[in-house]
């Protein structure tokens, strides 16, 4: 049988969606799923992704 891989599926969530108070934008949480290599990247991921609720690029952090 094959060994278990070091890749794990992680969820990225927008950090600015909850702090936004713009009434023109709908409330919602932007989440993305991706994979990361646990051996090479031990710390939490932090990427800039598009948030469709805020209609701009925002920082998305890895959640547990």
Swiss-Prot record:
One biological process term in Gene Ontology: translation
Under Gene Ontology molecular function, one entry of this record is:
structural constituent of ribosome
The UniProt entry, under InterPro entries, shows: Ribosomal_bL33, Ribosomal_bL33_sf, Ribosomal_zn-bd
Region (Disordered) residue spans: 19-40
Q: Which SUPFAM superfamilies match?
A: Zn-binding ribosomal proteins
Q: Which UniProt keywords apply?
A: Ribonucleoprotein, Ribosomal protein
- Gene Ontology CC terms: cytoplasm; ribonucleoprotein complex; ribosome
The record's similarity note reads: Belongs to the bacterial ribosomal protein bL33 family.
Q: Which NCBIfam families does this UniProt record tie to the protein? A: PRK00504.1, PRK00595.1, rpmG_bact
Q: What is this protein called?
A: Large ribosomal subunit protein bL33
Which organism encodes this protein?
Prochlorococcus marinus (strain AS9601)
